[in-house]
Amino acid sequence: IHYDIGDCLRSCCNPAGEETLSLENVCFDIDLCQAILSGYLSVAEGFLSDWDLHYLPDCIRLIPLELGLRFLTDHLDGNVYFHCDREDHNLHRAAVQFRLTESVEQQMPELRQLIDRLVKRQGIIS
C-alpha cells in the first residue's frame, strides 16, 4: 500500500513533471496531495490500519528518494536498466527525484498535519 500511494503522489504532485530540465521548478505540491489523499482515504479507510496511516508521510518521502537512488545507480552502471535519450538522462532524473525528496522533507510538518486533518475529517480512527 505504501509503495503504491507513495508512487502515485510522487508522480502526481510534482507539477514540473519527471522529465523537467529545470530543477528549480521541481516541488511537491501539497494542495494536489490533499486533493488526491482526500479521495484515496475516502475509499481506503476500510482497509488501512492505524500503522498504515502513521507511516503515510514517510512513504511519500521514501519513494522519490528510492527512485532517485535507482536512477543514480543505473547512471553509474552505464544506463543498462532505464531507457535513456541521452548520456546524462538518468543522472538528471536522479537529480529531479532528489529535489522532490528535498521538497517533501521541507514540508514534512505540514504534510503530517494534513494527513491528521484528513484522517479526522474522514472519521478514520487513528
Regions found by a protein language model. Name each.
Residues 48-60:
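All-alpha amphipathic helical-bundle segments outside canonical DNA-binding/catalytic cores
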